Amino acid sequence: MNSRMRRWAATSRLLHEDPPATPPSQDQQAEVLRRDIHILNAKISELENQMERLCRSLESTFNRIELLHSMLAQGEEEEEEEDGAEDIEENGEESD
């Protein structure tokens, strides 16, 4: 388990524990909030990185699909031209 996951698990565990007998001071509350914000910012950053990788992957996939589509269309055009040429050879004239 990486350090981020351990921190997240520890934070989650703290949420389910009984509160301390004395309320935390403002400094302690501020420290907890700073730590939580740091953890959340790290998670947000990781999610942003994952989204960027996903976007690049999707863009690459769409580019490959477009390339395959154009290759297929070109192959169909060539096939139609070959079929037309075969008809000319068989009949001695162009077919409609």
UniProtKB/Swiss-Prot annotation:
Superkingdom to which the source organism belongs: Viruses
Residue segments, region Disordered: 1-29, 72-96
Keyword list, A-Z: Early protein
Biased composition annotated in UniProt, kind: Acidic residues: 75-96
Protein name as catalogued: Early E1A 11 kDa protein
